[in-house]
Curated annotation (Swiss-Prot):
UniProt-recorded name of the protein: Aminoacyl tRNA synthase complex-interacting multifunctional protein 2
Cell location: Cytoplasm, Cytosol; Nucleus
Keywords: Apoptosis, Cytoplasm, Developmental protein, Differentiation, Nucleus, Phosphoprotein, Protein biosynthesis, Ubl conjugation
Domain of life: Eukaryota
Protein modification: Phosphorylated on serine residues in response to UV irradiation. Ubiquitinated by PRKN, leading to its degradation by the proteasome.
Gene3D superfamilies recorded: 1.20.1050.130
Region feature Disordered, mapped onto this chain: 31-51
Function: Required for assembly and stability of the aminoacyl-tRNA synthase complex. Mediates ubiquitination and degradation of FUBP1, a transcriptional activator of MYC, leading to MYC down-regulation which is required for aveolar type II cell differentiation. Blocks MDM2-mediated ubiquitination and degradation of p53/TP53. Functions as a proapoptotic factor.
InterPro entries membership: AIMP2, AIMP2_LysRS-bd, AIMP2_thioredoxin, Glutathione-S-Trfase_C_sf, GST_C
Pfam families: AIMP2_LysRS_bd (PF16780), GST_C (PF00043), Thioredoxin_16 (PF18569)
UniProt modified residues of type Phosphoserine: 36
GO cellular component, one term: nucleus
Region (Interaction with PRKN): 82-162
Organism of this sequence: Rattus norvegicus
């Protein structure tokens, strides 16, 4: 018998029903249509500011330009790797901005460095068996821009140098003291496999190859080009040195086709101004005999335009 008797708290014989919770806290359904919107809408993205939209527009323009430049470089690469393809590189991309040329002489200190009053002397070693005509043309052009002290020497490695090569700079009578010149240009006829250049014997390695030296010398004119024109100019210089000078007859024919196409659209290879591409290609054509009557019509016209300029006609006399 129990000590205490307690009445059951549920009704008689009815089953016990206990509602157990399924979550710790109950919240209203946020997806319900009847639910009022949240008062704190700080997490909602605000409309973009005008400055942000302008930045996005600039980004789109830059990306579009990069894609166009990539297409131009890919096209030039295709022409170099497949020299038999008749590819018109001038139509790959037209420059949005015209080529601008500086009319004032470039500050040589910005390119050659400061020598604290010493004359900046460019020294070139060249083989008389293959005179670098492009460098002689550029020398004459430099003389029109700067006061250049020009000298010619002969190295002991060569025995006989033609008289016209010894006088390739003309009669050099020094009328001024050395420190009054802006630039020194020393040419040494030497038995070297490739043309070499130095302008600071103590601090730099030599630049080798006629094309590379021509690029450097032409940079002293301060000529400015956009990225597309610079790519085309470098491509033409490489084509001259590797395909036109050392390539097969098939490669040379492809170069003539590309030149003829480019010169049909502009008086010079890249635009309306003379560039280092014209100088180097003209030099290689003269050295390899490619300037004969077999050249296409536009190339023949371009050759005459080059030879009408005094620096080209003077250099051409060295081959006679």
């Amino acid at each position: 018998m129990p000590m205490y008797q307690v009445k059951p708290y549920h009704g008689g014989s009815a089953p016990l029903r206990v509602e157990l919770p399924t979550c710790m806290y109950r919240l209203p359904n946020v997806h319900s249509k009847t639910t009022s919107p949240a008062t704190d809408a700080g997490h909602v993205q605000e409309p973009s500011e005008p400055s942000l939209r302008a930045l996005e527009s600039r980004q789109d323009d830059i990306l579009k330009r990069l894609y166009e430049l990539k297409a131009a470089v890919d096209g030039l690469s295709k022409m170099i790797h497949t020299p038999d393809a008749d590819l018109d590189v001038t139509n790959i991309l037209q420059a949005d901005e015209p080529t601008t040329l500086t009319t004032n002489a470039l500050d040589l200190n910005s390119v050659l460095g400061k020598d604290y009053g010493a004359l900046k002397d460019i020294v070139i070693n060249a083989n008389p068996a293959s005179p670098p005509l492009s460098l002689l043309v550029l020398h004459r052009l430099l003389c029109e821009r700067y006061r250049v002290l020009s000298t010619v020497h002969t190295h002991s490695s060569v025995k006989n140098v033609p008289e016209n090569l010894l006088k390739c700079f003309g009669e050099q009578a020094r009328k001024q003291s050395r420190h009054e010149y802006q630039l020194g240009f020393t040419l040494i006829w030497k038995n070297v496999p490739k043309t070499q250049m130095k302008f600071s014997v103590q601090t730099m390695c030599p630049i080798e190859g006629e094309g590379n030296i021509a690029r450097f010398l032409f940079s002293l004119f301060g000529q400015k080009h956009n990225a597309v024109h610079l790519t085309l100019i470098d491509s033409w210089v490489d084509i001259a040195m590797f395909q036109l000078r050392e390539g097969s007859s098939k490669e040379k024919a492809a170069v003539f086709r590309s030149m003829n196409s480019a010169l049909g659209k502009s008086p010079w290879l890249v635009g309306n101004e003379l560039t280092v591409a014209d100088v180097v290609l003209w030099s290689v054509l003269q050295q390899t005999g490619g300037s004969s009557g077999a050249a296409p019509t536009n190339v023949q016209r371009w050759l005459k335009s080059c030879e009408n300029l005094a620096p080209f006609s003077t250099a051409l006399q060295l081959l006679k």
